[in-house]
């Protein structure tokens, strides 16, 4: 990465921090004036009405900062960014169109509420816009041992994977700082990977979202319940999910030679493992118990960890650090152990952790029942 690219990445990172830092207090004020608040409920952990429009600042901040950086490059006649922008114009145009559609869907959902059928249709249209620009999981059939399947199956498989990632990010957003923290880990990982792949325009977008999320994380986690705290809402989680699934698939399209020390598919999947594994477990649980898999409950991993006795803050830190350590450990061991063995180890670890959580919850429930019996 040249000095020019480093300056651009630092500039867009700083601009996003500045824009979000200025915008969020104003969005909070608007939310209180219009009563656009997320009210406490049985399934939710917050105790006071809280603005849920933090995510409405994400896409405008990205587009404004991106435009400023491009404009500066045009004025100063620095050609590196402009050349890469021209070569990647179609996928970039497609992802911004998809982001705008997701943004509109999220705003409607945060203000009026949108059914999951409408969400699924809108998400499907958004991901198809990206796929038809050439962003697809071309090696997914081989990876899943489905090489004999016809070529046309690439499109539905890619669409399914993208919608799955979007909803995984949306559903993990259950406690303060968790979704934004996990996404920061993901964007940092993808940003570094794209630097090694010499795909600096995508590194730029990755680090831009890190800049978007840092001030939001501060307000979301450290803001007091009254007047300072804010949630990202569906607007934010859908925006983050859309960009993450786009960068995820772009990373799998990079030449494997540019990432000699780790399999590109594994690297793309690693930062998203916790939300994706959690969604698979929750959906399986709901189906096994005869419930609609698309209707919310309090059975996500963060809910379960809180029920074991951990605080909300400790749960958030534990899951974010686990994601970062899981990613780092897999990267370090990939050459020695191989992709399939590492993936099997990751799945086994996830199962063991969930079994331990189940045992802890059963023991706590047993203690509670015994104490109630003693009181009677």
Enumerate the predicted regions with their spans.
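"…together with the soluble PPM/PP2C metallo-phosphatase catalytic core" -> "…together
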Residues: 2-277
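C-terminal membrane-associated helical module and adjoining short loops/tails
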Residues: 1, 253-376
């Amino acid at each position: 990465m040249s000095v020019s690219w480093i300056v651009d990445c630092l500039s867009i990172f700083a601009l996003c921090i500045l824009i979000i830092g200025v915008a969020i207090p104003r969005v909070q004020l608007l939310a209180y004036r219009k009563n656009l608040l997320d009210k406490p409920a049985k399934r939710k952990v917050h105790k006071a009405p809280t603005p849920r429009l933090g995510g409405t600042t994400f896409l405008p901040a990205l587009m404004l900062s991106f435009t400023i950086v491009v404009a500066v490059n045009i004025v100063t006649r620095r050609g590196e960014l402009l050349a890469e922008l021209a070569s990647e114009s179609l996928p970039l145009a497609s992802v911004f169109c998809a982001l705008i559609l997701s943004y509109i869907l999220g705003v409607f959902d945060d203000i009026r509420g949108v059914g999951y059928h409408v969400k699924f249709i809108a998400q499907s249209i958004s991901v198809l816009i990206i796929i038809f620009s050439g962003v697809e999981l071309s090696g997914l059939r081989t990876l899943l041992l489905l090489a004999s399947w016809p070529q046309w199956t690439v499109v539905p498989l890619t669409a399914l994977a993208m919608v799955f990632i979007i909803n995984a990010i949306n559903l993990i957003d259950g406690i303060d700082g968790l979704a934004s923290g996990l996404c920061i880990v993901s964007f940092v990982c993808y940003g570094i990977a794209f630097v090694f792949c010499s795909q600096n325009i995508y590194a730029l977008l990755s680090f831009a979202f890190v800049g978007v999320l840092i001030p939001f994380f501060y307000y979301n986690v450290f803001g007091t319940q009254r007047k300072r705290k804010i949630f990202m809402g569906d607007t934010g989680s859908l925006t983050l999910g859309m960009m993450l699934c786009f960068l995820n698939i772009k990373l799998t399209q990079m030449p494997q030679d540019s990432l000699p020390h780790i399999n590109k598919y594994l690297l793309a999947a690693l930062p998203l493992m916790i939300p994706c594994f959690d969604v698979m477990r929750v959906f399986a649980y709901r189906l096994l118990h005869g419930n609609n898999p698309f209707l919310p409950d309090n059975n996500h991993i963060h809910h379960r960890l809180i029920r074991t006795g951990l605080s909300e803050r400790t749960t958030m830190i534990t899951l974010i650090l686990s994601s970062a350590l899981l990613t780092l450990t897999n990267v370090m061991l990939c050459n020695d152990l191989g992709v399939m063995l590492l993936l099997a180890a990751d799945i086994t670890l996830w199962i063991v952790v969930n079994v331990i959580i189940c045992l802890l919850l059963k023991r706590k429930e047993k203690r509670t029942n015994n104490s109630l019996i003693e009181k009677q």
